[in-house]
Amino acid sequence: MTTLVLDNGAYNAKIGYSHENVSVIPNCQFRSKTARLKTFTANQIDEIKDPSGLFYILPFQKGYLVNWDVQRQVWDYLFGKEMYQVDFLDTNIIITEPYFNFTSIQESMNEILFEEYQFQAVLRVNAGALSAHRYFRDNPSELCCIIVDSGYSFTHIVPYCRSKKKKEAIIRINVGGKLLTNHLKEIISYRQLHVMDETHVINQVKEDVCYVSQDFYRDMDIAKLKGEENTVMIDYVLPDFSTIKKGFCKPREEMVLSGKYKSGEQILRLANERFAVPEILFNPSDIGIQEMGIPEAIVYSIQNLPEEMQPHFFKNIVLTGGNSLFPGFRDRVYSEVRCLTPTDYDVSVVLPENPITYAWEGGKLISENDDFEDMVVTREDYEENGHSVCEEKFDI
């Protein structure tokens, strides 16, 4: 019996058999301006000749799976002959779902996995639980950790003790990668070029040039300087999808600091946008979202827990999710949490080598556990007892 592990994120699906490597694939469908009638699914995005004005059709809205038609088509593609050629009669699945997921969504997922695809056994679990499992496996002496999962739709902060989540201390911040990309689109559209339709391109810009400032006001001052002294400023060459397929940053020595470029390249000049956008993760109130930033929320979450456990959480803070890849993210989280924490506590912030696939790797480890059979719901169980058996088994 093989096990398929699917970390079903709102932006990317991380998928692979437990005995193989993981693939990271867009969990959505696309339509392009040029081929209006054709819908591209998942990694077929690579086939689109001109991805400007790319239109996204997402199965998730505000972090919850609501568009089942799209999700089904993406899964059909992933499980089908193009990708994983799943033999449902001989396959179990570990699949992730968001925290505090709605019962109606859980029931739909049970029905689709058991009745339509007919997997032999299912384990439905939060991505954070998989990350915690991986962390405890790497650090067997630790009993507690706090998982910071900063993804596409939100950032969740979840303490785990002996692999059980502490529900009373879970915090959600409504800031994720989608909001950052949208904010960057608005700033660039207001200041330079109209890019409101260019989600795909601007998302790439964000990933290529943005970083987390260690000293916001100092970087702001540098960004105001003229010419050579402005070390923050960068010129980004936008793709034209004929000669330049993917945007890139101009090397510092090739930048024309005054006047125009001779070549016909389309250039975005970015200065304070580079760090002002990720800053929203630390100060959501900058754009009118009245919520705590990540470091403050970590401390607040830990302070909701029994005092004797708190030191164990402060020294096991684990960062996962795509936003933790911003340069400087880990250092900033560490320095701010350190400032907010009593001096007699140790603080340690861990950024795994690949924070995007960390939860998937946890799922792979769980599938190899001796007690894996006790965690799943088998198809016989489901056919006999329906949704109630899933509710009892899965601690969501």
UniProtKB/Swiss-Prot annotation:
Molecular functions per Gene Ontology: nucleosome binding
Gene3D superfamilies reported for this sequence: 3.30.420.40, Actin, Chain A, domain 2 (2.30.36.70), Actin, Chain A, domain 4 (3.90.640.10)
Localisation: Cytoplasm, Cytoskeleton; Nucleus; Nucleus, Nucleolus
Keywords for the protein's UniProt record, in alphabetical order: Acetylation, Activator, Cytoplasm, Cytoskeleton, Nucleus, Repressor, Transcription, Transcription regulation
GO cellular component: cytoplasm; cytoskeleton; nucleolus; nucleosome; nucleus; Swr1 complex
Residue numbers bearing the N-acetylthreonine modification: 2
Residues bearing PTM N6-acetyllysine: 260
Gene Ontology terms describing biological process: chromatin remodeling; negative regulation of transcription by RNA polymerase I; nucleolus organization; positive regulation of transcription by RNA polymerase I; regulation of DNA-templated transcription
InterPro entries the record matches: Actin, ATPase_NBD
Superkingdom assignment: Eukaryota
UniProt xrefs under PANTHER family: ACTIN
Protein purpose: Required for formation and/or maintenance of proper nucleolar structure and function. Plays a dual role in the regulation of ribosomal DNA (rDNA) transcription. In the presence of high glucose, maintains active rDNA transcription through H2A.Z deposition and under glucose starvation, is required for the repression of rDNA transcription, and this function may be independent of H2A.Z.
Protein family per UniProt: Belongs to the actin family. ARP6 subfamily.
Subunit: Component of the chromatin-remodeling SRCAP complex composed of at least SRCAP, DMAP1, RUVBL1, RUVBL2, ACTL6A, YEATS4, ACTR6 and ZNHIT1. Interacts with CBX1, CBX3 and CBX5.
Protein name according to UniProt: Actin-related protein 6
Organism placement in taxonomy: Eukaryota, Metazoa, Chordata, Craniata, Vertebrata
